From Swiss-Prot:
Entry's family note: Belongs to the lyase 1 family. Argininosuccinate lyase subfamily.
Gene giving rise to this polypeptide: argH
SUPFAM superfamilies: L-aspartase-like
Keyword Metal-binding belongs to the record: no
GO cellular component terms, A-Z: cytosol
Molecular functions (GO terms): argininosuccinate lyase activity
Protein name as catalogued: Argininosuccinate lyase
Species for this entry: Staphylococcus haemolyticus (strain JCSC1435)
Length: 460
């Protein structure tokens, strides 16, 4: 008798190196818990439909639970000749409970079996990712609440542009993550569907009840089309996309953390616990965790591209190409979960150097727009005001001074509308307090923003 579950019509066994190429057990053993969960539901339904006996069902379920326990205790050895987690479990089950184990696959194919495992896995992991995003958002909000009045330079083109609230800046990432969170939540409608019972592609002649297994596995609905059930990998692509976009947002934040921690900026100080040193330069303190998060976005987006290319030319229904849907998915899930945990810890333990930030906004021209707005308030056309301020900035650069250092006499030479009150107008803290528009960096607007964010988290 052939050692293969499908070996009946074959006269030759594959060589070991062919088995090595064909096998997926090295990575799809990740799905053992989901495979056992799906098989227990399937066996329960088979017994309830009088397709197998209650005794056989009990033997199957007890055997599956023993296999699961042995796996987690490191007592289970898998065989590559058995290809994947599904056939390894089935083989082990038959060894333990005899013919009853051979009845488990009644009315089921590996095609709907693996699809069920993947739906269960993705559902579980997406829910955990949502929790991790919420936890990270809570850390961002807590940091922002402590720095509403902390002023920093805002940037465009990596050039200092306008003074902004540190809280306003970091809250930008809160809202990016909120969009990420909502995408994961919305994707659950396309993840939480049961393919079990679709069999290979056309359903089964056995009197199974697909809605019973749907309920046992706590899926919201079942696929309406058996071909679609076994061939659909849209939910994996969608999950990989959502992971990739979240990682891109984390990468952008990580880049800012890296810049802020440089000797040139010194805006923040990272905890030693989230930094490393150099093997040759003893003075170094490197932001390696932030750099790793920035670097890992490449593998996440790469896995998305790989899955898109894998799926693009596949005819219905199942093809072996779909074995390639797992490694990238598993790695992307590990990557985003690890990145979110690390980033939260890094944010919770870093120090914001408020004195340095305050010093910085008093030694730049980020208040130049304020001077232009000041002139506009004095009935100077904006384009004329823009030109006047540009000339003043050029003179300041030539003299090594800033706008607050320019004598009133010189201001009046440039435009007689400028009075003593210009100096209060140009102070960075006043630049912020005048920002009254909804969603702006003004302290009142930021405090309102924080209340909206806090309410959102509390009502989730």
């Amino acid at each position: 008798m052939s050692s293969k579950a499908w070996g009946g019509r074959f006269q030759q066994q594959p060589e070991d190196w062919v088995d090595e190429f064909n096998a997926s057990i090295d990575f799809d053993q990740t799905l053992l818990d989901e495979d056992v969960q799906g098989s227990i539901a399937h066996a329960t339904m088979l017994a309830n439909q009088n397709i197998i006996s209650q005794d056989d069902k009990d033997a199957i379920i007890n055997g599956l639970k023993e296999i699961q326990q042995d796996f987690h205790n490191g007592k289970l050895a898998f065989k590559k000749s058995l290809e994947d987690i599904h056939l390894n479990i089935e083989h082990e089950l038959i060894q333990r409970v005899g013919d009853a184990g051979g009845k488990l696959h009644t009315g089921r194919s590996r095609n709907d079996q693996v699809a069920t495992d993947l739906h269960l896995y993705v559902k579980k992991e997406v829910l955990e990712i949502q929790d991790l995003i919420r936890s990270f958002q809570t850390s961002i909000l807590k940091l922002a609440q402590s720095h509403v009045d902390t002023i920093m330079p805002g940037y465009t083109h990596l050039q200092r542009a306008q003074p902004i609230s540190f809280a306003h800046h970091v809250m930008t990432y809160f809202w990016m993550l909120e969009r990420d969170y909502s995408r994961f939540v919305d994707s659950m409608k396309r993840i939480d569907i049961s393919p079990l019972g679709a069999a290979a592609l056309s359903g089964t002649t056995h009197p199974i009840d697909r809605h019973e297994t749907q309920q046992l596995l706590e899926f919201s609905s079942v696929y309406e089309n058996s071909l679609d059930a076994v061939s659909d990998r849209d939910y994996i692509i969608e999950t990989l996309h959502n992971i990739s976009l979240t990682m891109i947002h984390l990468s952008r934040f990580a880049e800012e953390i890296i810049f802020w921690s440089t000797d040139e900026a010194k805006f923040i100080t990272l905890s030693d616990a989230f930094s490393t040193g150099s093997s040759i330069m003893p003075q170094k303190k490197n932001p390696d965790m932030a750099e790793l998060i920035r670097g890992k976005v490449g593998r996440a987006t790469g896995h998305l591209m790989s899955m898109l290319v894998t799926l693009k030319g596949l005819p219905l229904a199942y093809n072996k190409d779909l074995q390639e849907d797992k490694e990238g998915l598993f790695d992307s899930v590990r990557t985003i979960k690890g990145s979110l945990r690390i980033f939260e810890g890094m944010l919770d333990t870093m120090t914001v150097n408020t004195d340095r930030l305050n010093e910085t906004v008093h030694q730049d021209f980020s208040n130049a727009t304020e001077l232009a707005d000041y002139l506009v308030a004095k009935d100077v056309p904006f384009r004329k005001a823009h030109e006047i301020v540009g000339k003043i900035v050029f003179e300041c650069i030539q003299q090594g001074i800033y706008l607050l250092d320019v004598p009133l006499e010189r201001y009046k030479e440039l435009n007689s509308n400028i009075d003593q009150d210009v100096y209060d107008y140009l102070k960075p803290e006043n630049c912020l307090s005048r920002r009254k528009s909804y969603g702006s960096t003004g302290q009142d607007a930021v405090r309102h923003q924080l209340k909206v964010a806090e309410k959102l988290l509390n009502n989730d």
